[in-house]
Amino acid sequence: MRAARMAQSTGRQLLRLRGVSSWPGELLGQPRPGPARRPYASGVAQAAVDQSDSQPSEASTREKRANSVSKSFAVGTFKGQLTTDQVFPYPSVLNEDQTQFLKELVGPVTRFFEEVNDAAKNDMLERVEETTMQGLKELGAFGLQVPNELGGVGLCNTQYARLVEIVGMYDLGVGIVLGAHQSIGFKGILLFGTKAQKEKYLPKLASGETIAAFCLTEPSSGSDAASIRSSAVPSPCGKYYTLNGSKIWISNGGLADIFTVFAKTPVTDTATGAVKEKITAFVVERSFGGVTHGPPEKKMGIKASNTAEVYFDGVRVPAENVLGEVGGGFKVAMHILNNGRFGMAAALAGTMKGIIAKAVDHAANRTQFGEKIHNFGLIQEKLARMAMLQYVTESMAYMVSANMDQGSTDFQIEAAISKIFGSEAAWKVTDECIQIMGGMGFMKEPGVERVLRDLRIFRIFEGTNDILRLFVALQGCMDKGKELSGLGNALKNPFGNAGLLLGEAGKQLRRRAGLGSGLSLSGIVHQELSRSGELAVQALEQFATVVEAKLIKHKKDIINEQFLLQRLADSAIDLYAMVVVLSRASRSLSEGHPTAQHEKMLCDSWCIEAAARIRENMTALQSDPQQQELFRNFKSISKALVERGGVVTSNPLGF
């Protein structure tokens, strides 16, 4: 019972990531209680399904739907739609001046990490050397996206991604110091800060004179951010809040002077007068007093970064230091995290690039059995798969950054996918590099073991991959639920909504009959990639068929079906990976890039295997009795382990 409540709570928290309700549509059989409420009754989500009781016209229905249609490709996959606006053609967002400026930065930053920064020494010292920190400040590395007028470099997201890729290639420990500072540490001030807050804090943060940290996680609050216990009580005069609490595992916690802190505050409902505790974000200065930190944590990796517990004891925070709205802290936190995930993918694309170079160097020079080992099929497959994973991650990172630079607001699922994929791909690539290098890879000197240690945290950082998988699946299912709800409402007035009903019904009937939905990437992908484009469309149709069937079966209880949601997320990730490489390789082929044929091979190889994985996953999910037995077994085995306190079976020898 407790597990079920936890699962339901997790599901609802995940669906709050974009500020929407967690209730599926009326067609799914569970209307939300209350006279004026409808499924997904908040913001844009409500607009998607809100219908007048006076049977709306087809025109008004179309208008409402058009105003709320997501441009996200990932959202579209759950609905069986090819939403190509943000993925084709592969975006080129930098103008000539931006490109030239970026080129002028790439050289010095690369040389700095090759000639000045010593990643191995940083790891050994468990801190970044002061000369390195000073050099980074002189490069402007602490304020890459802060506007020029506030002392920063003023980079857009795509320019930022290119420089972060260099950092990730050379030293992930330094990358965490820089990322914890600007990707999340003061990102809230950039996104939500008032003019006064920006002018007061950003110049010194951009120069590196002051360091920032992001304080969300607590001993009792990890993935469930809404369960934080730190509190900020407003003074009777309303001029300040008194902040108490502690935060754990805070990157830059022992270095920071400025903290973005999340705490519960009492908020009065203006309509009812009821007082509820809601999360509020604050900009907190160490100089306020009452802010202390513990010793640096001893960690598996990213040892060069500072990680510490931070304590707030009766800290007086001025009311003007509220970040965003009072009670709006959850939204602030999620926007900060969503906004920064593409940078993680970009950094890890750089990490893989550096690791692949080490693996290739060893394979090209190591002789065994009278042959260079790169001539052996097993090594060739490893290198090829490493290249594919790097290509996909890099393609995702720059796709998302470009979408953001173009002003898109529908990138949350894609950003989460890029973080999941990149962190897992980098681990696989580095693990395989060690395997190719054999015993040498296990030694400290080549530095690959350090990278492997550094990488492990990235599947936990800024939203664990498990939680993000649930977010991807639940957000996609929620949007599909809105569509089903819209169809249900349209059925109340079939004549007034004939166009909508005939279009959707025809598409679904064709899909269910195995005739396809008429979707095609023909004319969108390069003709040399037409076969891979067909594989992507077929995979999307298989995926959408299963999503619809499972939503109709489970209704709102799909939030508890984590075994199912994980498998849906995996396929959504594969689908997005397919389209980003199809898009990038199509551009390279169309523009005649020197590496176009190599990219075609990477793309085709990825699409063949990804389509097979999706087909296998969806076929298994459609074999309902077997899948349900498997899921029941997982639950029972886990329960037995917990009750026993470990492994249940006895040794084969009986003692």
Curated annotation (Swiss-Prot):
It is an enzyme of class 1 (oxidoreductase). Pfam families: ACAD9-ACADV_C (PF21343), Acyl-CoA_dh_1 (PF00441), Acyl-CoA_dh_M (PF02770), Acyl-CoA_dh_N (PF02771). Residues 41-482 are annotated as: Catalytic. The keyword Oxidoreductase applies. Residues 49-59 have a biased composition (Polar residues). FAD binds at residues 214-223, 249-251, 464-466, 562. Homodimer. Homodimerizes after import into the mitochondrion. Belongs to the acyl-CoA dehydrogenase family. This is Very long-chain specific acyl-CoA dehydrogenase, mitochondrial. The gene is ACADVL.
